[in-house]
Amino acid sequence: MGQKRQRDQKGPTLHVRKRKRTGKPTNVAERESKPEVVVGVDDLNWKEVALPDRLDNFEGFFGLEEIEGVDIVRPQGNGQLRFKSAPGKPGKSILKKPTPKSEETEFDDEWNGFSDEDLEKKEGASTVNEVAKAADVNGKKGKDAKNKKDIKAKEPKKKLKEQKEKDGAQAKDRSITSGLSFAALEDEADDDGADISAWEPLGLSPETLTSLSKLKFSTPTSVQKSCIPPILDGHDVIGKASTGSGKTLAFGLPILEHYLERERRKTIDSEEEKEKIPIALILSPTRELAHQLQKHIYGLISNAPGVNARTALLTGGLSVQKQQRLLETADIVIGTPGRVWEVLRTGQGLIRRMQGIKFLVIDEADRLLSEGHFKEVEDILSSLDRVEDGGPPDEEDDSSEENVVPGVERQTLVFSATFHRDLQQKLAGKGKWTGGDIMNKKESMEYLLQKLNFREEKPKFIDVNPVSQMAEGLKEGIVECPAMEKDLYLYTLLLYHPKHRTLVFTNSISAVRRITQLLQTLQLPALALHSSMAQKARLRSVERFSSSTANPGTILVATDVAARGLDIKGIDFVIHYHAPRTADTYVHRSGRTARAGASGKSVIICSPEEMVGVVRLAAKVHANMANGKKLPLESLELDRRIVSRVRQRVVLAARITDSNIAKEKITTEDNWLRNAAEDLGVEYDSDEFDQAKGWGRGRGRGRQERDRQVGSTSKAELAGLRAELKELLSQRVNLGVSERYLTSGRVDIEALLREEGNNSFLGQVDPLGF
């Protein structure tokens, strides 16, 4: 019983045979026996090839059609070429689709008048109907219900679809017409909105007023009061106002009003839009500003009842295909010039649709229209002003009068805090320097009229603050220090403001990377932002810096990519680690604080080499100062005791940071050389390469030697430096107070226990003098 029964391996296997599949070969034979469909050129289902709007080297090659899945049948002799379906391709798929009979006979039936035959047919049909009625009198009652059901069941679906569309249009009409009264304001009784009585003189719609109430915008700013009425009246406007004065709403509200007017007109006229044409195109110089504009306008739209306007954001770093799909249904297009031009140039029919926009908004116009910066802006403007003549647009013949729109129907809105070209002149240098009036209206108008094609000969120039473009609540200061001790004075300034959200500006990407690592080594919450970062990383840094749940002492180290238009609430302090190169850069940098009537501080850390540029800066920005100040930039004196106490911290952090950066640089260079040697099939020896590189005396030799020495720091040495720095950071900066006898000095013990005041210092610290 314990033994298993063994199978006879030989007997059964000799007689078992695999079943042959006979069905498939017969089907193949039948399939092969079927005659192949051979057709001519005109019988194929040709598909037109979609071409982009802007072509470079096609040279008039249009009307291209293609077909896939066909083989060429070459006839004997010189006959006409024939085609058949490729193997594995159904024959019907390559044939042209037959037109329905209804379409064929729709235009073939013509009325030829009355004839005697038609009258005889009608008389015969009437007699047959009378006989049928007499025969079915008794069974009429029993079939009425059934006939009604059949009629209802056989109702065409087209009528149901039309009814649904009609009901939807009526519902939409009710939603918009209901917004014509102030009933929309009563629907949100539970939400404590702001008092918007100050907005009523501007003549805005109830939907817009509801949105402003929800967003807590109780009072319009001076630029909004001055710009909104002429924009609503259809004028071209050039608006100049200080940073943080609400320029986004100054052009966003008229765009929303035009959208509401267009929707009301469509419902009254019962018009169906054949093709979606955007209302406005808004251009901005940076991606962060474009994202911010989209966020503000979307908030304005989403809080307005019955408004379903769509926005499309076109910036670099994101998918082009997705942005093209968003552009198909967009009402408002916001983007940077490079990506907007790329999407328009590679799309089909997008330039023609964009020519129908009603508003062209150029935010931060002095930056977008500056010489040699944004060539795509000129391409966009020329394409919007071009008339289609039935052929491809000729890029070389831009000056021809035949291709330019004679009368532009769109409004052009231009906004910035600085328009004068003199502000874009470099402050440092030996070139000719011109001071004077920075708000020369005549030169600004001539400069803009040369660049833009306005609808009016003289657009309205609205200057809200002609004397100074700096915010009223902004305090400006300067800290003088040696060139090699900027890190020390930067850290000291940050210790003076521990709970202030600070923005540090530099002039280079390498400085952003180094300062960010330095501050992080000093255990400060620092974030980086520059143009070489990936788009998602840039958005992540801005989101973390502006988050309400973030550390109130968060520091953002950025290049001038964050200088324009970035509206982040709670920025109290702006530090210029490097003196700005131009005066308009200083204006926009300092404008990140003291926004919307709030107060803020702006400090320049100035070395002796930068003093000439800072003096010119003060002369340009504060040329027409009328407040009676002798010095527009106050000189700040830091406590020398604090500077000497924290010097060792900064020295240790700088050694650690420089070592890490040098090691990363050496590793990156070594990996690049190793990969290049592998591609060339050459053996790579790092020691031999370094020895060969040391023979020369080229430029940068000293820097390379210094990087090699700094990068040679061992891990044990770095660990010792980190431990020493950690010990120093765990202690407060002692300003001459005995730690054993705290009550003997000027120390507020109760404030220390409650953790009030500046926790970085132990002792009395006088605040900065501004």
From Swiss-Prot:
Residues 228-437 form the Helicase ATP-binding domain. Residues 105-118, 391-401 have a biased composition (Acidic residues). It is found in: Nucleus, Nucleolus. InterPro entries: DEAD/DEAH_box_helicase_dom, Helicase_ATP-bd, Helicase_C-like, P-loop_NTPase, RNA-helicase_DEAD-box_CS, RNA_helicase_DEAD_Q_motif. A motif (Q motif) lies at residues 197-225. Residues 489-639 form the Helicase C-terminal domain. PROSITE patterns: DEAD_ATP_HELICASE, HELICASE_ATP_BIND_1, HELICASE_CTER, Q_MOTIF. GO terms for biological process: rRNA processing. Transmembrane segments: none annotated. Its main location: nucleus. Its EC number is 3.6.4.13. It catalyses: ATP + H2O = ADP + phosphate + H(+). ATP-binding RNA helicase involved in the biogenesis of 60S ribosomal subunits and is required for the normal formation of 25S and 5.8S rRNAs. The Q motif is unique to and characteristic of the DEAD box family of RNA helicases and controls ATP binding and hydrolysis. This is ATP-dependent RNA helicase mak5.
